[in-house]
């Protein structure tokens, strides 16, 4: 700042002020003279300044330190222990000695040595550090530091009488620690060489105290600022008492006070600078804490999800096992029901077959009763019965030669035995099924093979309770029946004389058949041409027996061969003997 704006002093005035002999002197600033530049330490005499000696004084405020030079300016002697009153009158915004003494000047904001409402005196700061070091083990173990700082505040209030909240204590300690770290790491950037005032206490708490470095150096820039603040724009009246202090000591004491204020201002500025770095470290800790909370939250949710998935998988497995057991039980029950149904169906067809066999036996007995001669059972229900039937047929064909009717019956049974024992009912059912499927056979005529149709016919015969027949046997049987039908129709068309014997196989008759119309047979055993055509129907044994009867002149055998008993069964008129056995003769094919 420009020096012309402040009161100017010369060397004589300064010496007179320093050597005042106990009288009150009023000094009026002069506008013509200035403080010389050598007063600031540039051109002083080469006298080594004594060590800094600070004299403690007591005021209405807290404890403070007054440099010796400033004390001398106040008019009091250090040896006599007299109190001095320094009155400075200012106009505008100037700063006097009173503002410097009560902490409102250069040293008011450094570390809180002032005694105001928001300031921390040195003794209170030392008390805070002592309590904090005493509770250091609790701070290291606790996660939440807030209750511990409340405990520090309570101890300071109860034991030492300082009223500070836990939050203020924590903020003060953080500022002290931040500046301590910067000082220890050499980042404080101090030029006066003064170490931090609370470095020893913090070093005992956080590290070794061997790094204490003190390098005395004067900061001329801040000293000039202090001297500049010492001046005011208006005239200043200073009332002093006499003093026996030398001029050199007074000037050096004043210079020492300026250095002390420089230390205070420097410490305060560095603490304010370090507060921003402390905020950064606090934000980093909060960020790390936030990341840890997020990680813990995700881990907790993942554990819950895995546990829920395990429970769900266990339930799903149990449900699948229960469903599988139910399915197996239902399948087993269905198998039992199906087996029972098949057994019931087999039993039904067995009863039906037994009923049909009983009916056939009744018919045979009726024929035996009417003819008065024994007949051979036409149906063979088992291989043993088939073998026995064939043997009986051979025996009867050899022994029974008395009449032609016996020989005709034998021939009929032999035909049935030679045709793998096809019964009359079985032949009728074969013809019925084949006739019902005639349209299907016509559709595939000239196309694909009809083997599957004959297999279907054989399966239907098995379902009706007959013996198992292959599709080839059914087809051959049908062709054999068809050939016989065609030949019989030819004989009917020729109107031959009726004969008592037939082809040995029951054929369904139509309206053109003379058996129903004229009660005549279309077959003649005496016709050699017809015998040759029906060689598959007749047997060589029956032909030999018939020829033997005719040759030997046995008229009864010849008559028996040429006599038909069908008119006898039909009876005279509208009555017939079939009805007495519950049978009814019909012209339809399926009866």
UniProtKB/Swiss-Prot annotation:
Residues 118-177, 422-479 form the Myb-like domain. Keywords: Developmental protein, DNA-binding, Growth regulation, Nucleus, Repeat, Transcription, Transcription regulation. CDD domains: GT1. Residues 388-410, 515-534 have a biased composition (Polar residues). GO terms for molecular function: DNA binding; DNA-binding transcription factor activity; kinase binding; protein homodimerization activity; transcription cis-regulatory region binding. InterPro entries: Myb_DNA-bind_4, SANT/Myb. Transmembrane segments: none annotated. It is found in: Nucleus. Induction: Expression within the newly arising sepals is repressed via the PINOID auxin-response pathway. Confined to flowers, at low levels. Also present in 7-days-old seedlings. Barely detectable in other tissues such as young seedlings, roots, stems, leaves and siliques. Expressed in flower primordia, more precisely between newly arisen sepal primordia and also at the basal margins of developing sepals. The keyword Nucleus applies. GO terms for biological process: establishment of petal orientation; negative regulation of organ growth; perianth development; petal development; regulation of DNA-templated transcription; regulation of flower development; sepal development. It comes from the Eukaryota. GO terms for cellular component: nucleus. Interacts with KIN10. PANTHER family: FI21293P1, TRIHELIX TRANSCRIPTION FACTOR PTL. Transcription factor that prevents growth. Regulates perianth architecture in flower, mostly in the second whorl, probably by suppressing growth between initiating sepals, ensuring that they remain separate, and by modulating organ shapes. Required for the establishment of auxin flux. This is Trihelix transcription factor PTL. It comes from Arabidopsis thaliana (Mouse-ear cress). The lineage of its organism: Eukaryota, Viridiplantae, Streptophyta, Embryophyta, Tracheophyta. The gene is PTL.
């Amino acid at each position: 700042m420009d020096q012309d704006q402040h009161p100017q002093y010369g060397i004589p005035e300064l010496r007179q002020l320093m050597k005042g002999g106990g009288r009150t002197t009023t000094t009026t600033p002069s506008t013509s003279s200035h403080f010389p530049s050598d007063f600031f330490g540039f051109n002083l005499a080469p006298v080594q300044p004594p060590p800094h000696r600070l004299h403690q004084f007591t005021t209405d405020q807290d404890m403070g330190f007054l440099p010796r030079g400033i004390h001398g300016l106040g008019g009091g002697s250090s040896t006599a222990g007299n109190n001095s009153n320094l009155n400075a009158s200012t106009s505008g915004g100037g700063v006097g000695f009173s503002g410097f003494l009560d902490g409102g000047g250069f040293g008011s904001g450094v570390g809180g040595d002032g005694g105001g409402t928001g300031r921390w005196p040195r003794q209170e700061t030392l008390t805070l550090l002592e309590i904090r070091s005493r509770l250091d083990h609790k701070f290291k173990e606790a996660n939440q530091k807030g209750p511990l700082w409340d405990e520090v505040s309570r101890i300071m209030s109860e034991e030492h009488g300082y009223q500070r909240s836990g939050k203020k204590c924590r903020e003060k300690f953080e500022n002290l620690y931040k500046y301590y770290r910067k000082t220890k790491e050499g980042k404080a950037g101090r030029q006066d060489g003064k170490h931090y005032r609370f470095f020893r206490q913090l070093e005992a708490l956080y590290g070794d105290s061997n790094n204490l470095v003190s390098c005395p150096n004067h900061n001329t820039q801040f000293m000039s600022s202090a001297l500049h603040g010492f001046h005011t724009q208006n005239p200043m009246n200073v009332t002093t008492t006499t003093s026996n202090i030398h001029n050199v000591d007074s000037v050096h004491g004043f210079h020492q006070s300026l250095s002390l204020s420089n230390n205070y201002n420097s410490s305060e500025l560095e603490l304010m600078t370090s507060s921003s770095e402390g905020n950064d470290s606090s934000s980093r800790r909060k960020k790390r804490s936030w990341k840890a909370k997020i990680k813990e939250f995700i881990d907790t949710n993942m554990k819950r999800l895995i546990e829920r998935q395990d429970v769900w998988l266990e339930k799903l497995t149990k449900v699948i096992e229960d469903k599988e057991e139910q399915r197996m039980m239902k399948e087993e029950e269905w198998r039992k029901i199906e087996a029972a149904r098949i057994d019931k169906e087999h039993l039904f067809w067995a009863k039906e077959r037994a009923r049909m066999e009983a009916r056939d036996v009744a018919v045979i007995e009726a024929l035996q009763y009417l003819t008065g001669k024994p007949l051979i059972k036409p149906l063979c229900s088992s291989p043993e019965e088939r073998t026995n039937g064939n043997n009986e047929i051979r025996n009867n064909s050899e022994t029974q030669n008395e009449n032609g009717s016996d020989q005709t019956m034998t021939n009929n049974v032999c035909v049935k035995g030679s045709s793998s024992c096809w019964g009359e009912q079985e032949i009728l059912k074969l013809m019925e099924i084949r006739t019902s499927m005639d349209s299907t056979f016509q559709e595939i005529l000239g196309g694909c093979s009809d083997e599957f149709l004959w297999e279907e016919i054989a399966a239907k015969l098995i379902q009706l309770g007959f013996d198992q027949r292959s599709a080839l046997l059914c087809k051959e049987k049908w062709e054999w029946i068809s050939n016989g039908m065609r030949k019989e129709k030819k004989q009917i068309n020729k109107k031959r004389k009726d004969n008592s014997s037939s082809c040995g196989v029951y054929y369904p008759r139509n309206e053109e058949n003379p058996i129903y119309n004229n009660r005549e047979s279309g077959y003649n055993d005496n016709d050699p041409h017809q015998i040759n055509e029906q060689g598959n129907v007749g047997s060589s044994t029956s032909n030999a027996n018939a020829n033997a009867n005719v040759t030997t002149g046995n008229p009864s055998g010849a008559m028996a061969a040429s006599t038909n008993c069908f008119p006898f069964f039909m009876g005279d008129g509208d009555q017939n003997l079939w009805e007495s056995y519950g049978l009814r003769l019909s012209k339809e094919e399926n009866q």
